[in-house]
């Protein structure tokens, strides 16, 4: 099964999200757009289904693929909308105003800042995983 990376992002200054993937085995690229990360993913998946139908009509065999989604910071907070920007910013020690700018796509974090944000989110996930509820 071919593993395909789908990039979900919102460019600085854009209102819509995009989701893009390239399926090398059939030399096809698919782009989805939407006002949310979920909508962009759904649009991309619909485009992939349409592409598979077109390829079948042309007699091209399409094997199943495994899609792995990658997100920029803004798309991550939009897709996982239960993640609180203020809470994450407190956890990792970044100004909540700056985090909101990253989440809304007004600014892009540096590579180092992005790594710090991802590390903080993973730290929060570990804390939640270890929580005992009675």
Feature locations, PLM:
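Short loop/beta submotifs within extracellular cysteine-rich repeat domains
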Residues: 125-126
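Short glycine/proline-enriched turn or capping motifs at secondary-structure junctions
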Residues: 13-17, 110-111, 115
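Short, basic, alpha-helical segments at the C-terminal edge of helix-turn-helix-like DNA-binding modules
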Residues: 116-122
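Short, charged, surface-exposed hinge/linker loops at domain edges
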Residues: 5, 46-97, 101-103, 107-114, ...
